[in-house]
Amino acid sequence: MEALKVEKFTTANRGNGLRAVAPLRPGELLFRSDPLAYTVCKGSRGVVCDRCLLGKEKLMRCSQCRIAKYCSAKCQKKAWPDHRRECSCLKSCKPRYPPDSVRLLGRVIVKLMDEKPSESEKLYSFYDLESNISKLTEDKKEGLRQLAMTFQHFMREEIQDASQLPPSFDLFEAFAKVICNSFTICNAEMQEVGVGLYPSMSLLNHSCDPNCSIVFNGPHLLLRAVREIEAGEELTICYLDMLMTSEERRKQLRDQYCFECDCIRCQTQDKDADMLTGDEQIWKEVQESLKKIEELKAHWKWEQVLALCQAIINSNSNRLPDINIYQLKVLDCAMDACINLGMLEEALFYAMRTMEPYRIFFPGSHPVRGVQVMKVGKLQLHQGMFPQAMKNLRLAFDIMKVTHGREHSLIEDLILLLEECDANIRAS
C-alpha cells in the first residue's frame, strides 16, 4: 500500500487540518479519493451521466424512475447499488425534484447503513465531520429544518421512521454536515456537474492563497501541490470562486462555513481595486444581470445567454474594462455560449479578452487558468492560427501538468491537440 503523503493534525486556531508528511513538489499528487456519496447537480440533470458525470448528447433513462440518466448500460449497471433505494423515491416525488443536498444525504445514509469501510473516510469519517450547528443563525437552523422535512417526504418510500436510519443518526445535524462539507464536482471545463462528500478531504482548511488545488476526473477527486511545500506545513485549498472581492469572500465563508477569514489577502484587500475597476453604477448593473445570465445557462439557453451578454458588452464598450470581474464573467459566458452554438470565431474574440485578467487573478498554477488557456489554444487551432495556438497550448500544458497531472484525461486531450498543432506547423 502506498504511503500517505498527508496526515491529520490539530491546528493552533482552526481545528483539524491536513499537513505534509515530507517535502512536496509542485504537481505532486497528494491524495486521490472517490466520494462517500455523490449526485448530479440539478442544473446538469439530464445533460450528464448520473454515474461518470460526462456529457453526452443521447443519454438512456432509468426505466423505473425515468429521472436518472446514463451514457451506457455499463454505467447504469455500476450505478445501480447507489441508485437502487432512491429510485422509487425519485419516481414518487415527480414532477418535483429534491434539492441536491436532499438527494446527496439519501445516498450517504444508504452508504452508512451498508457499514462497509469507505476509502473516502481513510483520514476522517462522516461522523467526524464538523456541523457548526452552534454557530448557525436561527434562520439557517430553520432552513435545515425545512430540508429535513423535505428529506422525510422524499425518502418516505424507503425510510418510514428513525429505526431505519443508522444508530444515533441526527437528521438535522447530518444536513448541517452536508452543507458545510460537500464539494462541488466540476467537469473538464471547470463547470459544475455534481456535488459529493469526500470526508477525508474535509480536513483541508481554506486559504485565499492556497498551496494545493483539487480537480476532478468524473467523480474522482485529485489533490495536488501547486507550489513547494515543506514537511509539516499545513495544506490548504480555496473553498471559493477566485473572482470575488475580499468582502464577498469573507461573507460567503462566514455564511456557509461559519468562520472569518483573516488572511493577508483579505486584510489588505488584495486585487479588490482591479476587480472593481470602472464606473460603480455600471458594474453593479452588470452584477445584477449576471443572475439572469446564470439562470439561462443553467437551462442551456445559449441563444438567450449570448444575446444578453452581447447587449451588456456592447452597451458598456469603453465604460467598463475587461479586468472588472463582472465584465469578465460576462465575457466568459459569451465565450461559452458561442462555443455551444458553434460560433468559434466569435468565441475566440471573447476568450482573448479574458486572457490578461485571468493571468492577474489566477497567478501561478491554477486549474481554472489552465483550462481557459487551453480553450483559447484549441479555438486558435481550429481557425488555423497554428503558431499562436502552439504558444497557448504549451502554456496550458505547463500549468495543467501541475494542477491536473499527466494521467488526467484532460491532459491526454491536450497532448493530442499539441501533436495536431505541431503536425500542421510542419506541413505549412
UniProtKB/Swiss-Prot annotation:
Histone methyltransferase activity strongly stimulated by HSPCA. Zn(2+) 2 binds at residues 62, 65, 83, 87. Residues 272-428 are annotated as: C-terminal domain. InterPro entries: H3K4_H4K5_MeTrfase (IPR050869), Hist-Lys_N-MeTrfase_SMYD3 (IPR025805), SET_dom (IPR001214), SET_dom_sf (IPR046341), SMYD3_SET (IPR044420), TPR-like_helical_dom_sf (IPR011990), Znf_MYND (IPR002893). GO terms for molecular function: histone H3K36 dimethyltransferase activity; histone H3K4 trimethyltransferase activity; histone H4 methyltransferase activity; RNA polymerase II cis-regulatory region sequence-specific DNA binding; RNA polymerase II complex binding; RNA polymerase II intronic transcription regulatory region sequence-specific DNA binding; zinc ion binding. Keywords: Acetylation, Chromatin regulator, Cytoplasm, Metal-binding, Methyltransferase, Nucleus, S-adenosyl-L-methionine, Transferase, Zinc, Zinc-finger. One of its GO terms (cellular component) is nucleoplasm. S-adenosyl-L-methionine binds at residues 14-16, 124, 132, 205-206, 239, 259. Residues 4-240 form the SET domain. Its EC number is 2.1.1.354. Belongs to the class V-like SAM-binding methyltransferase superfamily. Histone-lysine methyltransferase family. This is Histone-lysine N-methyltransferase SMYD3. The lineage of its organism: Eukaryota, Metazoa, Chordata, Craniata, Vertebrata.
